Each structure stands twice: as C-alpha cells, then as structure tokens.
Amino acid sequence: MEKNTLIQILNNLIEKYKTLLKENGKVASGDLLNSIKGEVRVDNNLYTFVINLNDYWKYLENGVNGTAVDNGSTYSFKGKTVNTDAIEKWITVKGIVPHSINNKVPSTKQLAYVISRSIARNGIKGGHYLNNSLQSTNFINNIIEEFSKQVNIEINKITEVNI
C-alpha cells in the first residue's frame, strides 16, 4: 500500500476542513487551525488515520445546547455563563470595539460577560465542518479505492505465480 497516497488523501481532508472553518468565520486566534495535524499509522497491515486537534473542535462540529435553546447536541451548557476569559480573548483577537450605551462604553470584561450569558442561554449551533469535509472530499471512497487497487495488485501477483 502506498502510504504517501493515503497521507495525501488525509491531507486533502484536513485542508478542506480548514477551508470550511475559515469560510464559515470559525477562525479567531488560529489556535484550532494550527492544532490540526494528520498522521497515517501502519502496524502489521493495520492502517489507522489520526487527526489531532484541540478538543473544542467537537463543539463547533456538534454544537452545544443552551440553557434555553436545544440545538440537538449531546453537549449542554449548565450555568448562566460560559468561560468569559475565552470570550475576552475572542473579542480582542477579532478587534471588537464595544459601542456606547447611554453614553457609557462597556469594558471588554463587561462585553464578554454579556456575550457569555447569551451563548450559555442560546448555545452554539453545530456546523458539521469535519463531517462535511469527509463527504465533499470523498474520503472514505478514496481510501476504499486505494485499498481495492492494492488488493487487485496482490490478486494479480498470485494469479501470475499460479499460471
């Protein structure tokens, strides 16, 4: 089996996934994108495709239910707010400037708190970016095709020897 071909199939999947995240505005700091690494492992003719990435990919993929809104996810927010530190970082990275309300400009911390309450209440809708990447790159079919080619090569070798 050509491991390089399998690596290329995996890399195509990863690039498509990164593209979908970018196209859908799911890149702020780039931490998730930079964490994505793929690997094909081979052990005694057992092929394993591994994608390592930050844990929060699953929330972008599957969404998170809010305390007031069910987004059909297996994950749910329990409290009234989510991690305000992460929201503050997101505000800073995105360059979001709070607008004046009643001649008072909220601090980044205050804005993060309001946003975190909204996220906890409404949840996060899943984007299914990895699943969509799997489908659009024909990942499974491409792997099956590569293994089929290898099986045909092996069958031809056997039949040539036995003829």
Q: How would you describe each model-predicted region?
A:
Residues 1-46:
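Charge-rich, low-complexity N-terminal segments
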Residues 31, 35-163:
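Charged, low-complexity interaction tracts
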